[in-house]
Each structure stands twice: as C-alpha cells, then as structure tokens.
C-alpha cells in the first residue's frame, strides 16, 4: 500500500464521495493505468475513470531569477462504476 499515501479530505472531496469518486494522494511516479490496476485488485472494484494532477508546494528562484515550481505530490480522483464502493471510506449515503 506504498503507492497510496493517504486520502485527501477537503470540502470538494467529500462532495465527490457522494458521486462515487474517491480522492487520493499517491506516489509521484504512479500512472493512471497503474493506479487503476492496483485499485481494482486491492479493493475488488471496477474503475470507470481516473483524473490526476500534480500539486505544487512552493516556488523557488534560481540564480538567473527564473521561477521554479516544485512538485510536492500527485492527486488522483478515482471514479468507480455504479454499485461499487470502497468499504474503507463508507461513502454510501
């Protein structure tokens, strides 16, 4: 379970739980297909789609005064097919 760091809990992610979408913070090297295969095997569910984004933490400056953006983590929103849910989060309302 080292690919999945933790669940992201924000106002938006709680609203997405009602639409059967789960938000995770994952390893930076993890791809969408890798995440899909891992989620389907580990939780025994069917994944309909995945959205991913690389989240930035801070900006830095180099000697030549160019702005550099550091990537701190990757966030994935996993959308499951109907009648499937991840029992860990108990999102069924």
From Swiss-Prot:
One Pfam entry name: Ribosomal_L23
Keyword DNA repair: no
Subcellular location: Plastid, Chloroplast
GO function terms (MF aspect): rRNA binding; structural constituent of ribosome
Subunit structure: Part of the 50S ribosomal subunit.
Function according to Swiss-Prot or TrEMBL: Binds to 23S rRNA.
Name this protein carries in UniProt: Large ribosomal subunit protein uL23c
Provenance organism: Adiantum capillus-veneris
Encoding gene per record: rpl23
